[in-house]
């Protein structure tokens, strides 16, 4: 691992400690809460759509979300570690066999639907256990930093 990769990994870990990023992939429906500044006021705006691509790696990683707004397709690219992103929430998991879902741009209505990935009870239990473990690790890390 070279120096740049090491620095990027440290920075990413620091940013993840502040705001955890859920595991999601193309095909998943996500809600991205974006901080929008209007004059002096800052508010949070929800942007819900299907993740159609994930690009890059490390600190430069980004993802593209597509939604239909008033009958018009709208796509927005979000850097994963952007300070303008308040939170990311996965609404449903999609079952797709491609990394880039750009073909959805040409489809309308039912043709643009993505089948939902069904989760087995064992996988769900494993995910919940991992979530609890991550929460406990974050709590321990916070307690350790407070003790210093």
UniProtKB/Swiss-Prot annotation:
UniProt function note: This protein is located at the 30S-50S ribosomal subunit interface and may play a role in the structure and function of the aminoacyl-tRNA binding site.
Keywords from the named record: Ribonucleoprotein, Ribosomal protein
GO term, biological process aspect, one: translation
Name this polypeptide is given: Large ribosomal subunit protein bL19
Keyword Ribosomal protein: yes
Pfam family membership, one: Ribosomal_L19
InterPro entries: Ribosomal_bL19, Ribosomal_bL19_CS, Ribosomal_bL19_sf, Translation_prot_SH3-like_sf
Organism: Beijerinckia indica subsp. indica (strain ATCC 9039 / DSM 1715 / NCIMB 8712)
GO molecular-function term, one example from the UniProt record: structural constituent of ribosome
